[in-house]
Amino acid sequence: MRRRENMDVNKAIRTAVDTGKVILGSKRTIKFVKHGEGKLVVLAGNIPKDLEEDVKYYAKLSNIPVYQHKITSLELGAVCGKPFPVAALLVLDEGLSNIMELVEKKEGGE
């Protein structure tokens, strides 16, 4: 069941990257979140602790939800269609993706 949920989230992330506006990378994510921009932050499961704390701190100040994904940064990069690791990403516009619904449902169920 959990694997199915991860696949749904992965598909939603990819759809958001392809059809919406997504910022990749922890530095750029923090920069945008500090200005209160964005709808959702997605963090890789192996993001360094200091970066995780920074992103979560600024996201909380800006009232932007944070989703901690179970996959590694290399896998998150692959989900985004990139040949490099992605430790954090920020969804500015989800496009045709249902990522916001999936994350809300998943957080409500846990």
Curated annotation (Swiss-Prot):
Q: Which Pfam families match?
A: Ribosomal_L7Ae
Kindly state a single biological-process term from the GO annotations of this entry: translation
From the record, give the transmembrane residue ranges.
none
| Record InterPro entries | Ribosomal_eL30, Ribosomal_eL30-like, Ribosomal_eL30-like_sf, Ribosomal_eL30_CS, Ribosomal_eL8/eL30/eS12/Gad45
Domain of life, source organism: Archaea
SUPFAM superfamilies linked: L30e-like
The yes or no answer to whether the keyword Metal-binding is present is: no
Kindly list the GO CC terms recorded for this protein: cytosolic large ribosomal subunit
Q: Which GO terms describe its molecular function?
A: RNA binding; structural constituent of ribosome
| Alphabetic keyword roster | Ribonucleoprotein, Ribosomal protein
PANTHER family named in the record? RIBOSOMAL PROTEIN L30
Which HAMAP family does the entry link to?
Ribosomal_eL30 (MF_00481)
As for family, the record states: Belongs to the eukaryotic ribosomal protein eL30 family.
This protein is called what?
Large ribosomal subunit protein eL30
From which organism does this entry originate?
Answer: Methanocaldococcus jannaschii (strain ATCC 43067 / DSM 2661 / JAL-1 / JCM 10045 / NBRC 100440) (Methanococcus jannaschii)
